[in-house]
From Swiss-Prot:
Summary of the function given for this chain in its UniProt record: Plays a major role in decreasing resistance to glycopeptide antibiotics.
Residues spanning the membrane: 47-67
Entries under InterPro entries matching the protein: Mem_prot_TcaA, TcaA_2nd, TcaA_4th
Name of the protein in question: Membrane-associated protein TcaA
Phylogenetic lineage: Bacteria, Bacillati, Bacillota, Bacilli, Bacillales
Keyword field: Antibiotic resistance, Cell membrane, Membrane, Metal-binding, Transmembrane, Transmembrane helix, Zinc, Zinc-finger
Gene that produces this protein: tcaA
GO CC, one annotated term: plasma membrane
Membrane topology value: Single-pass membrane protein
Highest taxon of source: Bacteria
Length: 454
């Protein structure tokens, strides 16, 4: 076999002419070209294995570089740093999540802002790189906590096995704290946690956890419900001011507190004063802040109090929703003339009743003492309602009864035919004691009789 010197076509050694270009060949060309071709083929055969080996080595180097770029401790660190630097909350959430702790992108976004403001990207990148290098050179599996400029832990770095049997696998864990509330009223909170709706019921004046969070400055949109209504706002908590395992939540809702001042109440019984807000009655106090109430609804407020057993109502006022602020006040006035007129009338009646009772107890005292000294129940029986408890008691214990001396009526009230009175008298030791009596008045004759004593 030879090669045409003109076109390079392979030609059978027995041919004198190139079948391709028609060039004529002589025996000299055939003799020269054949050895050259054989030598070239031998060289090519020797080169091919070395070329394959070189290719495999280059390929392995490329694969190693690629694997190292994604799996070495330094590469793992760069992935986290770049994710935070590029505000890739989804990537950060994935890197910080574990089987026992899921972190969503919203929480990761707050965490990124926290690192930027409390650590700074340059310090963060420098600290985490130095920490990983320290751990990578050490055989210890002890974790290292990264701290903010204020000294608060924000990231725990540790070794967790290996990757591809070559590289240390780095573990990045954000520390957590419980966000806690302590409401003054029984409260139901609704908000999103981990992308899902969450409901927490908190009892009044008891510490309750809303959930566990990684470092950040949070403002969580929420709704809450109390006995006074429904509110919209935010649950705010800041890890810069957290304690060892908890961080307190500050509530920021559309709330309206209300203080109430009353005029014309001087003649009313102090303990009977009440305010009525949105149909709910509460004990009155001039220093109390009532509520909170939603700023989205009108607030209606009134007041009531008693004098001589009668209930008096103050004027009613309504504060429109558009006028409600965080702190609101309402001044309500009673009709003091109506109250004073009623008191005068009742006092006149009471004085008349007290006079009537004073005469009754004066006669009763004299008659009872006579009945005791004579052991004659019939003398006093007309002062006692037949078969009443006091009737039976005196009848059965007349001989053991003590003298009833110097009775004085302190107070008296009448409702229908029933009279209640408080009487002070001297006991056998010469000391005053007070007894409450119940009497019945005959509606036809006006006569009164004792029914019970306490």
């Amino acid at each position: 076999m030879s090669i045409c010197p003109k076109c390079g076509q392979k030609i059978d050694s027995n041919l004198n002419k190139c079948p391709n270009c028609g060039n004529k060949l002589d025996n000299k060309d055939n003799q020269i070209n054949s050895p050259q071709i054989n030598t070239s083929n031998i060289r090519i055969r020797k080169f091919i294995p070395w070329a394959i080996v070189a290719f495999i080595i280059v390929l392995l180097i490329i694969v190693f570089v690629l694997v190292r770029n994604y799996n070495s401790p330094d590469a793992q660190t760069k992935i986290l740093v770049n994710a935070i630097d590029n505000n890739d909350s989804q990537k950060v959430a994935t890197l910080l999540s574990s089987k026992n702790s899921h972190i969503d992108s919203d929480e990761a976004s707050v965490y990124i802002d926290y690192i930027r403001s409390e650590v700074g990207m340059k310090k963060f990148a420098r600290d985490i790189k130095s920490t990983v290098e320290t751990l990578n050179k050490s055989d210890s599996k002890e974790a290292i906590n990264l701290k903010t400029r204020a000294g608060n832990n924000y990231l725990r770095v540790s070794k967790n096995g290996t990757r591809l049997l070559i590289f240390d696998n780095m573990s990045y864990t954000a520390p957590t704290k419980k966000a806690i509330v302590k409401p003054k009223l029984d409260t139901k909170y609704e908000f999103k946690d981990g992308g899902k709706k969450k409901t927490v019921i908190a009892d009044a004046n008891k510490t309750t956890s809303l959930g566990t969070y990684i470092p950040g400055i949070y403002s969580v949109d929420a709704k809450k419900e109390t006995e006074y209504g429904e509110f919209s706002g935010q649950l705010k908590f800041d890890f810069r001011y957290g304690k060892s395992n908890t961080v307190e939540v500050n509530e920021n809702f559309n709330e309206a507190l209300l203080t109430v001042k009353l005029k014309g109440k001087s003649d009313l019984d102090k303990d009977s004063l009440k305010v009525e807000i949105n149909d709910k009655q509460m004990k009155y106090s001039s220093s109390r802040e009532y509520g909170p109430y939603p700023q989205t609804k009108d607030v209606t407020v009134s007041a009531l109090g008693k004098a001589k057993g009668k209930t008096f109502h103050a004027e009613t006022k309504t504060i429109k929703a558009r006028d409600l602020g965080n702190i609101n006040s309402a001044t309500l006035e009673f009709d003091d003339e109506e109250i004073s007129d009623y008191i005068e009338e009742k006092e006149a009646e009471e004085n008349s009743l007290k006079t009537k009772l004073s005469n009754f107890f004066s006669n009763y005292s004299f008659t009872l003492n006579s009945a005791i000294s004579r052991s004659d129940f019939n003398l006093v029986s007309t002062f006692l309602k037949d078969k009443s408890s006091i009737y039976k008691s005196i009848k059965n214990n007349l001989n053991q009864s003590v003298a009833f001396i110097n009775p004085q009526v302190i107070s008296a009230s009448q409702k229908g035919n029933t009279i209640n009175t408080k009487v002070q008298h001297l006991n056998s030791n010469g000391q005053y004691e007070t007894t409450n009596y119940e009497l019945r008045e005959d509606s036809d004759t006006g006569n009164i009789q004792l029914v019970d004593s306490k």
